[in-house]
């Protein structure tokens, strides 16, 4: 099993009131799968995604990645884990505004200690592949939302992570752009064997996933594999 | 390089705020440099004033004379000492003096004074008493019945030019000796000590009064350079022998200048710390604001694998760049202003009295003393780096999830 979550729960302390975002959720994610988390707002999609992505630690339960219990690792180790194995796409893209498109992508490679020339070559190549090769020297605010989203995805996958997590990936994109992006992701999923997990409200994305996990009030209410169609 | 670039780009985000911070550092440092320059200039002039006014660089006495002023403690083997000293290449000028406690009296008043017998010709080459004569004139070489008195003393005992005074003192043989002199000049040096307590007659008449013959109490030496004082003292210790003579440098004779220096440096040290705190708080404020404004961005950076220590490095680097630019600005600005007033001088003619009492000049020429500049810069770097640690540490402690979703 690639990722295994065992009875994970998450309680946030909102001022003095405890908020239970996740109640004893157990899920297994297979390597190379293309999974969607859906459900109403506040159902715990983001929380689950962050726990699977080592971004946060559960209040209860355990998370394993390839059999290693990541929920027990130190903050420093988790950081390194995320850097090597995981790619993130955050809502609203969250690019670094002072850096150009290609530098945003390069940043991850710099964190991995890859040298300057190699870095620029790889970052530019990914941007090219995402159809933004001509725009790589623009700052994020000089790009359209669709273009920014591509940069965000390029940043998430440039270091060839095993797992890519996306939160509200297409929520601010028009139908056509969102659909195009999905095409890219499916391609990567097939070719690079990257495992993808997304949280979304978007029916188009849900439709194209290989597996749909529905959540409500911090619980998984349904989990079905669909026939994958590209 | 990437980190440096990122830090630099972050600084240029809010150009105005960064500029204000750089200015705060720059102006603060420039002010400190100027303040040191002012103090160092003042003290340098005080040193020269004291040396020129009275002490010369070094004085040689019989051991114990400076404290006791006993008339019988004249310099043994005066001629040999004179020849030896004159042969030292560092020595540029020499004069001799007789010094004793005496009583100066008119028909109505009398007062205890320090009677100084000087060789008018040689004295004027070392000290500038002559320039301070306000009324009348300086001593004639053979003016053996002439006396110079300070303006304060003249006022106290009611003396005027050409008045007659009687000077009485204990002679070598223990008897009471007394002569009448005519006031030929009244001086004003600004030093209360000298103006109120010292009177000058010629060396020859003082020797006669005390029955000293050719002997003197004091040899005053001017070296070609003040830096030569310490080596000269070393030389004197060996060549003259320390058991018979005391060889004193100017700042042992007038310790007030050194005391003043210490005091002023302590005051500036305090100001230094205050300025540092202001600069530090200003930098901290800027950096904290800039962190607060990009909480989400920093959260994302951490989420995608930036380690807390890299965040610390980034924020510290931003602090250091701001500070570095400020230091460059402050160094250049402070240096130029200090150099400028070193040429032009800052006049304090309005408060002359207060200044001259402590041997200060009324026009201060500022002076750049590099050790003080370096000290200011190093303190600035240390203190503000230390202060910069706090925002950096705070940024690195952020939880990525909270930063990204709840800010
Ligand atoms: N850091 C936090 N502090 C307090 N409460 C939190 C925190 N994070 C999440 N919650 C709460 O936990 C619950 C689940 O939130 P979560 O963000 O996982 O929902 P979601 O399914 O992603 O919703 P949406 O579709 O709106 O993004 C919500 O009630 C939310 O208010
Ligand atoms: Mg969410």
Protein language model regions, located:
Chain A
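ABC family nucleotide-binding domain
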Residues: 2-208, 212-215
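H-loop (His-switch) and adjacent beta-strand-loop-beta switch element
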Residues: 212-225
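A short acidic/small-residue loop/turn micro-motif
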Residues: 227-229
